[in-house]
Amino acid sequence: MNIPNSIIKEKLKNVYFIWGRGKTTIANRLKDEYCFYIYGTDESRNRQMNLANPVDQPYMCRDYYKEYGVKTFWELPKEVIAEREKHFVEEMTPMMIAELIQLSTLHKVIICEGDIDYYAVAPVATNIVHLTNQSTTFDWFDRPDHENIRDIVAKRTDLSDEEKQRIIDHAYECVTPDESSGTDWVAELGLKNIIWNDHTSIDMTTTDVADYFGFVKQVKNDY
């Protein structure tokens, strides 16, 4: 069954997508200020994996740990991590969109933050903003919703200190984007891009996002 984009877009008109770096921080701040419902795609992964089947979601069903003989995700080769994430997100996106359509009937405003198939969602979404975080202190692993790679590796008793450091360095290499072309796709899709850095506070960026979405013109806590 192929559902026209216009129908999906109408169903998602009260869903506001925040993409890029710092999206979780800004989404949580909007929740604090407006009591919005937050849909985190990272939090939905396990739920979607339980629904996946090898025919329709082969990448979601693959046992990469067994295939490559590793104990943690970040021990996989960098190219395997990139390929796995690309296809995993592509397969998971229709499942998340189905959930968002259902949730859109229960909430006046939904903030959807997290990784999703941007090219698939852009044509069916009315509200999207992309964040470019240029802060020199940004650490992908140093946040409450991400497992701290240093803590995880430090607890391993089967590795030497040198092996532990190699895994840590490899993990950071895998999550470090290519800044030279990091926002090319944002411009290609015609998305609003908001830059924040060491001179921009979380409050300022939250206000920029809220203003772009038109939230500041509405009554708080009425969602």
Regions found by a protein language model. Give the residues of each.
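Short hydrophobic/aromatic beta-strand immediately N-terminal to the Walker A/P-loop
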Residues: 14-17
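Walker A/P-loop
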Residues: 24
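Post-Walker A helix-loop "phosphate-sensing" segment adjacent to the P-loop in P-loop NTPases
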Residues: 32-42
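ATP-dependent small-molecule kinase phosphotransfer cores
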Residues: 46-108, 115-116
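ATP-dependent NMP and nucleoside kinases share a basic, alpha-helical "lid"
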Residues: 112-154
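Small-molecule kinase domains that catalyze NTP-dependent phosphoryl transfer to phosphate-bearing small molecules
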Residues: 146-212, 216-223
